Regions:
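Well-ordered beta-sheet/strand-loop patches within structured domains
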Residues: 11-15, 34, 38-42, 49-376
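Short, hydrophobic/amphipathic alpha-helical patches that form generic packing surfaces
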Residues: 4-22
């Protein structure tokens, strides 16, 4: 009986370590485009036996815990949110905002004392003494800014509907969101190469990591624009980057050509020349639209492409990792969009804010690719 219990316990710990390292769910069962290579690299039996031989079970836990830098922060946030379960500040919804839809600095609103309690509980501001007037004070505005920044809201210190909606989400629901984010972090195959690029889609940021003896070292961080969350979301997958292309042509996907480019050209024939578009059919290239060549695009025997230049949708460079979804990283001429707080604006590809910095990170093994050469 004791031997049977020991075997079952050993098996249960191995399962726990495997789930901790790889995740409980195989992302491929959710139709996410992940390769399974990294899931085979972790052997829970070996890790557990080594820890037992050393008399240190914590060693196994450390070995199984994902090295993804954000994972530790997520675990800390999960513990904090779980500790707030049932907190009195969320016992009731906040009252409706006035017709203006927001509360500005110095204005009064009956819900502000509860807002202050929630922000203090979440660590975004210091606790406010009981009986404090229901006014949007400078201290409360700073707390709102901290909360808004953490939730990808416009950090303006104003209490608007989006901020109220976010504040009304109970800690228990937030804890579930964090737990799901931790599961996704376990899917991230950071140890597969000596350098990794990770796009945090809901955060609208890209990170570049170097892997040194199992340690994950952050090297690059920048804002990105990702796919529209409802219509053309950026899919989750992992692939190997194979090449970088400077001054690229943009081959307009047929879905965009049908829904946007061709209707625009039909309304305004001069649009094609102004934007640097041309129609390619076999060895023929035309810069003038006609019913015949536009129909050829629609039936798949021709394609629209955009010439390199200041108007090119891909900007100065694209970073390619072949995949069946035609998703890649690229620059953009519309750099002002990076100043937005919510940046789900693309058709699925990821637009990067600092293409030169990213190219340096990707091409660093080749000393001929200097910053000056890349910038040209």
């Amino acid at each position: 009986q004791a031997a049977s219990l020991d075997a079952r316990l050993h098996q249960a710990v191995q399962r726990y370590l495997t789930d901790l390292h790889n995740g409980r769910v195989d992302p491929r069962t959710l139709k996410e485009n992940y390769k399974d290579d990294h899931r085979k690299d972790f052997d829970a039996s070996v890790v557990l036996n080594q820890a037992l031989d050393n008399g240190d079970l914590g060693q196994a836990w450390k070995a199984a815990t994902p090295s993804f830098p954000a994972y530790a922060s997520l675990r800390k946030a999960l513990h904090q949110l779980q500790a707030l379960s049932g907190h009195a500040a969320w016992n009731s919804q906040l009252p409706a905002l006035p017709k203006s839809g927001r509360i500005a600095a110095g204005q009064e609103w009956a819900g502000l004392p509860v807002v202050a309690q929630r922000l203090a509980a979440l660590g975004d501001m210091a606790a406010v003494p009981a009986g404090t007037p229901a006014t949007l004070t400078p201290a409360l505005r700073e707390g709102l800014k901290a909360f808004q920044a953490r939730h990808s809201l416009s950090a303006n210190g104003l209490l608007d509907r989006k901020t109220v909606d976010a504040l009304n989400i109970k800690p228990e629901a937030r804890a579930e969101q964090v737990a799901l984010a931790m599961e996704r972090a376990r899917w991230t195959p950071l140890a597969q190469g000596k350098r990794m690029i990770v796009v945090n889609v809901p955060q609208f940021r890209l990170y570049g990591y170097e892997i040194d003896q199992g340690k994950v070292i952050p090297k690059v961080s920048m804002r990105v624009i990702v796919g529209k969350s409802l219509d053309t979301r950026t899919p989750m997958f992992d692939e190997d980057m194979t090449y970088v292309e400077f001054s690229p042509y943009w081959n307009v996907p047929i879905s965009i050509a049908r829904s946007e480019t061709i209707p625009r050209i039909k309304r305004d024939p001069g649009y094609m020349a102004r934007q640097g578009f041309e129609i390619v059919q076999g060895n023929s290239v035309s810069s003038s639209p006609s019913a015949a060549n536009l129909n050829a695009v629609l039936n798949g025997s021709a394609r629209i492409r955009q010439k390199p230049g200041p108007r090119n949708a891909l900007g100065d460079v694209k970073f390619m990792f072949p995949n069946n979804m035609n998703i890649y990283l690229h620059h953009t001429p519309s750099t002002g969009l990076f100043n937005r707080d919510k940046r789900d604006l693309s058709h699925g590809c990821v637009r990067v804010e600092e293409p030169v910095q990213l190219a340096q990170f990707v091409l660093q093994d080749d000393p001929s690719w200097t910053k000056e050469r890349i910038s040209k």
